[in-house]
């Protein structure tokens, strides 16, 4: 967005590509952080942009909006989400727990009386939830998700290679090299950045093994969160989980070897959902399409 008048220039992937590359008169902003609103004004502008694209020539059209939110957010944060969406032009706002949306998008039978464990690893938070009868029986969240992993990669390169890189480059390293368990052949990658000593451009070669070690703390936090959730699960639901196992969704589910590591740590079946990146969006879409499901899992505020 432009600093002078706060006009929106780009949204989404196009805006993300500008991170760390904007001139002084343009500001790249993340409206949401750790699953909640970080900047109310910018959030409303972003939502208004989306709704305007939906409206097209129908200027009076005001959509019904369903939004997935972390199960751990407070009532104040829930109202902040509602207010921002209403100000952006929505007719009605319904909130749904993000793990429920992800479970629906992954095709889990959450309306049945049986335990389903979903581990939704997003950008800001990882949520582990036990879901039954279309509701969250138990949920635990931790800030050990994709953004935190990017930060760990930046920190590792700064400490061990005296190299400063941006968050986009860190994400590229994560996608290319990161893993939670040794898989396949040893991989290396050349990374460009700025030498913290000389202040000049510099290139270093890094390995998948050192990135796996750099992300060790983040992966361990996810494992501990899953264990806590399983320990709090009712015995009847625990029996279901032994058979059904754990389903991974969100971008973090694509971390190489994460399913193998979690199986090793929990001794439960673990699988990555089909299209884990979009499970949350697919689940919200199902709620909008199926009125009976919408009434069960989405709550107006």
Q: Which residues does each predicted region cover?
A:
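Acidic, divalent-metal-coordinating active-site segment for phosphoryl/phosphodiester hydrolysis
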Residues: 126
């Amino acid at each position: 967005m432009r600093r002078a008048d706060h006009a929106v220039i780009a949204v989404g992937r196009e805006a993300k590509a500008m991170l760390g590359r904007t001139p002084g008169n343009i500001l790249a902003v993340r409206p949401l952080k750790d699953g909640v609103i970080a900047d109310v004004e910018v959030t409303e502008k972003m939502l208004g942009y989306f709704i305007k694209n939906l409206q097209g020539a129908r200027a009076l059209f005001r959509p019904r909006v369903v939004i997935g939110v972390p199960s751990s957010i407070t009532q104040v944060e829930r109202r902040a989400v509602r207010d921002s969406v209403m100000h952006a032009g929505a007719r009605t706002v319904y909130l749904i727990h993000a793990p429920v949306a992800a479970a629906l998008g992954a095709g889990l039978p959450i309306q049945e009386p049986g335990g389903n464990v979903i581990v939704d690893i997003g950008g800001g938070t990882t949520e582990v939830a036990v879901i039954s009868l279309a509701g969250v029986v138990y949920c635990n969240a931790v800030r050990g998700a994709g953004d935190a992993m990017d930060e760990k990669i930046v920190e590792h390169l700064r400490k061990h290679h005296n190299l400063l890189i941006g968050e986009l480059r860190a994400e590229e390293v994560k996608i290319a090299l990161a893993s939670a368990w040794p898989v396949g052949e040893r991989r290396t990658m050349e990374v460009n950045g700025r030498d913290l000593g000389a202040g000049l451009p510099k290139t270093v070669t890094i390995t998948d093994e050192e990135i796996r070690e750099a992300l060790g703390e983040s992966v361990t936090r996810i494992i501990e969160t899953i264990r806590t959730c399983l320990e709090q699960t009712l015995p009847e639901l625990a029996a279901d989980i032994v058979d059904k196992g754990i389903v991974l969704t969100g971008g973090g589910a694509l971390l190489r070897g994460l399913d193998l590591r979690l199986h090793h740590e929990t001794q439960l079946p673990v699988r990555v959902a089909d299209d884990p990146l979009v499970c949350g969006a697919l689940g919200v879409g199902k709620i909008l399409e199926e009125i009976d499901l919408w009434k069960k899992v989405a709550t107006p505020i």
